[in-house]
Regions:
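Conserved alpha-helical substructure of the radical SAM core
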Residues: 3-44, 48-66
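Short glycine-rich, polar/acidic loop-and-turn segments at beta strand-coil junctions
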Residues: 1, 12, 44-46, 71-75, ...
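Conserved AdoMet/S-adenosylmethionine-binding subsite of the radical SAM
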Residues: 50-170
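Short secondary-structure boundary micro-motifs
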Residues: 2, 24-25, 92, 100
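Twin-arginine (Tat) signal peptide motif
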Residues: 1-4, 119
Length: 171
């Protein structure tokens, strides 16, 4: 992962070197090829940093398997990930992106200085491609991450607050 979040459930981060090997990707593709699997849910951090991510997505979509990419939005702003947003859109990958809050101070306090700004740029890049517009079929879901040992608030008012604030502040 390109971030170091204290709450990370997979203990990912830029100093970690482990990644799923090419042989394991081949096994996943073989399993998908056998049939019966409708959705491939790829989780991160930033699973796009795996050297075999695009090959896995292409294979899954070629088999008619829905692909979900659970990621952070800042990965779209990494120089070595040029064309990633376009790749995801071209393959109709559903994006489940972590955005812990719609306020920059809260996000940067949880994830590091500048993370909010890069997240908004990534979100705008996805929106420009049709993600979240309700017409393109490109699905974008934002995930709220509570800070501390607490449950999140009810989804409907939280979703509306995100939409209202992000729309008014960033278009």
């Amino acid at each position: 992962c390109n971030q170091s979040c204290l709450h990370c459930h997979v203990a990912a981060g830029p100093n970690r070197t482990e990644e799923m090997a090419d042989e394991d990707i081949d096994l996943v593709i073989a399993l998908l090829s056998a049939g019966g699997i409708e959705t491939l849910d790829i989780t991160g951090g930033a699973p796009e940093l795996n050297a075999h991510f695009r090959r896995l997505v292409e294979a899954a979509r070629g088999l008619g398997v829905k692909v979900m990419d659970r990621c952070n939005l800042t990965i779209l702003e990494q120089p070595d990930q040029a064309g990633l947003a376009e790749f995801l859109a071209a393959h109709q990958v559903e994006i489940v992106a972590s955005l812990p809050c719609y306020l920059s101070d809260n996000v940067d306090a949880q994830r590091g200085k500048g993370v909010f700004k890069d997240s908004i740029r990534g979100l705008q890049r996805l929106n420009a491609l049709g993600y979240g517009d309700g017409r393109s079929g490109l699905v974008l879901n934002l995930v709220y991450n509570p800070q501390g040992a607490q449950l999140p608030p009810a989804q409907e008012p939280l979703e509306q607050a995100y939409k209202d604030r992000l729309r008014s502040d960033y278009g």
